[in-house]
A protein has these predicted regions:
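Short, low-complexity intrinsically disordered segments enriched in A/P/G/S/L with frequent Arg
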Residues: 20-27
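C-terminal segment of classical bacterial N-terminal signal peptides
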Residues: 17-18, 38-45
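Bacterial N-terminal signal peptides
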Residues: 9-12, 30-41
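N-terminal, motif-rich segments that launch catalysis or mediate targeting to/interaction with membranes
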Residues: 45-211, 222-369
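Positively charged n-region of N-terminal signal peptides that target proteins for export
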Residues: 1-3
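Generic low-complexity, intrinsically disordered segments
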Residues: 6-7, 18
């Protein structure tokens, strides 16, 4: 892993001149493609958006929050913490030799939508529970193994190649965690929580907001909702790119070689956050999250078409079209994330168990006096 990172650092140093200037000519993209192929695995080992892209999504989401949103979220320290945590799930992926962690964390970053059909499933009729979904993947494989490509055990040490991704379940579950966090905070604030308890509850909320942003950001990256994640696979009538390094170029190579990501101007494209999901309908939030993935999926072919037309090459005078699509996806990710944060705050219910305990504690303390 360390050797790969060193080589990748060398790649960035060669591809981008000192000072972050414009690379000289098309060899930049060719060099990136050649070197990235040496270090990036085929499969879902690569990350969606580099750290700066994930930071941008979380920062854009913060721009969507209304004036009345809890003030502790808006302090400079909290905003930086939320932005930093955008990269946390990818840091977990850096522990390549920790197979239980890889098994748990890896599939939460993607969903290969086209592969649902292989299991007789459709995006509109997926179960809202992740283990119900994994069962629906396991049963056809067990009943008709001949219909599925064999899995190489040497490349499946973390036992994730039987899966096609769990990203929408991860997002929905994090929404529930955030609702719980707001419920706990309100209970501590209203029923005699100590300053330390209130501060810890606030820190829990900040943590969940930051980490969940990663998965929402992943699903704004078109290559994380398709089987064509590392180059086009199967029938290819349009002659789209098949090189596995395409993923890394979209994650961050393009932005690094075209001036980076400027969050300020993009923030102007963010509207105020709105409610997502009807809490009276248990499956509604999941359906809204799936709709978000399906919208992202609409950009898969346009993204490959831009590559085919060299509009994702820094030296092309029409590279602005490639930047527009990718920046648009960052904005969509930030918008969705802001909506989910806002919804969790608005829809948080009473934590009756905690309220009861706090009430009993307060009464006991009063009696002692």
């Amino acid at each position: 892993m360390k050797r790969s990172l060193i080589l990748f650092a060398a790649l960035a140093a060669v591809a981008l001149p000192p000072g972050g200037g414009r690379p000289a000519g098309r060899p930049c993209l060719v060099l990136f493609t050649a070197l990235a192929a040496l270090v990036l695995p085929v499969g879902h080992g690569a990350f969606a958006w580099d750290y700066e892209g994930h930071r941008a999504v979380n920062q854009l989401a913060l721009a969507a929050l209304p004036q009345g949103f809890p003030a502790f979220i808006k302090t400079p320290a909290a905003r930086e913490r939320i932005a930093f945590l955008a990269g946390e799930p990818d840091r977990w992926r850096n522990q390549g030799d920790d197979l239980p962690l890889a098994h748990f964390n890896g599939p939460d970053h993607y969903l290969d939508l086209e592969n649902l059909e292989d299991y007789g499933l459709t995006p509109e009729a997926l179960p809202i529970f992740r283990y119900d979904f994994t069962a629906k993947l396991a049963l056809p494989r067990a009943a008709h193994p001949e219909k599925f490509p064999p899995i190489d055990p040497a490349r499946n040490k973390d036992h994730t190649r039987e899966l096609i991704g769990l990203a929408p379940w991860a997002i929905t579950e994090y929404c529930g965690k955030l609702k719980s966090g707001f419920s706990c905070l309100k209970a501590f604030q209203d029923y005699g929580g100590t300053p330390e308890e209130i501060a810890n509850a606030q820190e829990n909320i900040i943590y969940v907001m930051g980490v969940m942003g990663h998965y929402v950001g992943d699903c704004a990256q078109p290559l994380h909702v398709t089987k064509h994640h590392h180059g086009w696979v199967g029938d290819n009538p349009h002659g789209f790119a098949t090189n596995s390094s395409f993923h890394a170029w979209i994650d961050g190579g393009f932005f690094r070689n075209t001036g980076g990501i400027k969050v300020g101007p993009l923030s102007g494209k963010i509207r105020p956050a709105k409610i997502v999901g009807d809490p009276t309908k248990p499956d509604d939030l999941f359906k809204q999250v799936m709709a978000y993935l399906l919208e992202t999926h609409k950009q898969v072919e346009p993204l490959y078409q831009l590559e085919k037309e060299h509009k994702l090459s820094p030296e092309n005078e029409k590279a602005g079209e490639g930047r527009a699509l990718l920046e648009g996806q960052l904005v969509k990710g930030g918008q969705m994330l802001g909506d989910l944060w806002f919804s969790a705050w608005q829809q948080a219910t009473e934590d009756k168990y905690l309220i009861r305990n706090l009430t009993e504690r307060k009464a006991a303390n009063t009696e002692k006096k």
